[in-house]
Amino acid sequence: MKRLKEQLIETYNALNILLHEEETENKVTTATKLIVDTLKENHPFLICGNGGSASDSMHIAGELVGRFLKERKALNVICLSSNPAVITAWANDYSYEDIFARQVEAYGKKGGVLLGISTSGNSKNVIKAFEMAKSLNVKTIALTGKGGGKLSEVADILIDVPSNHTPRIQELHIMLYHYICERIEEILS
C-alpha cells in the first residue's frame, strides 16, 4: 500500500514540474484573459467535463456565479455537466457523445468561450462540444493531462498538466482553476 508521504511526493513532483513550466503560465494567462474578455461582454462562459471533471466544472461555475474570494456581481457561467434532465434526455434519445455539443448549440454564441476538462483529453463528448463551438465561433480552452490527447488538436488553448496519473492531474487542475477564478475576480471586481 502506498503511504501518504509517497503520494504527497508524487503530487509535489508534478507541481514542481508545473511550477517551472513558463509555457503553462503563459497559456493560463492567455486563457484567463480570454475568459475575462468574454465575461466583460456578458457572453457565456461554458464549462463541461465527465465524472471528476464534471465536478470540477460545477465547482468553477459555483465559484464564478456565486463568489470565490470577493463580493461582486454574478458572472455568466454555465456548467453543461449539471443538468440531469437535459443530459439524460439527449443521451437516451440520441447519443451520450452529443450531450455537451447540443448544449453548446443552445447556449454558445460568438464571443463566448468553452472550457472542456478531460484528464485524458480524449472524452468524445467534450471533443464534439469543441467541434460545435468552432462552428459557432466560440473559443475553446482544454484543461487536460500530459499531451492533451485528441483535444490538443481542436482546442484554441491547451493547458495540459505534467502527469498521466488521474489523481495528480485532478490535483493540478484544481490549483490552476482556483488561480484562474482568483484572477477573474481580481480583474472584474
What function would you assign to each model-found segment?
Residues 53, 58-189:
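Glycine-rich phosphate-binding loops that contact phosphosugars or nucleotide phosphates
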Residues 14, 41-42, 154:
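Structured helix-beta-strand junction loops
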Residues 7, 14, 31-34, 60, ...:
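A ubiquitous structural signal for well-ordered alpha-helices
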Residues 35, 49, 64:
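Conserved hydrophobic/aromatic pocket- or pore-lining residues that grip, position, or stack substrates
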Residues 44-48:
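Short glycine-rich phosphate-binding loop at a beta-alpha junction
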Residues 1-23:
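Generic N-terminal amphipathic, Lys/Arg-enriched alpha-helix
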Residues 20-41:
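A short, well-structured juxtamembrane/interface segment
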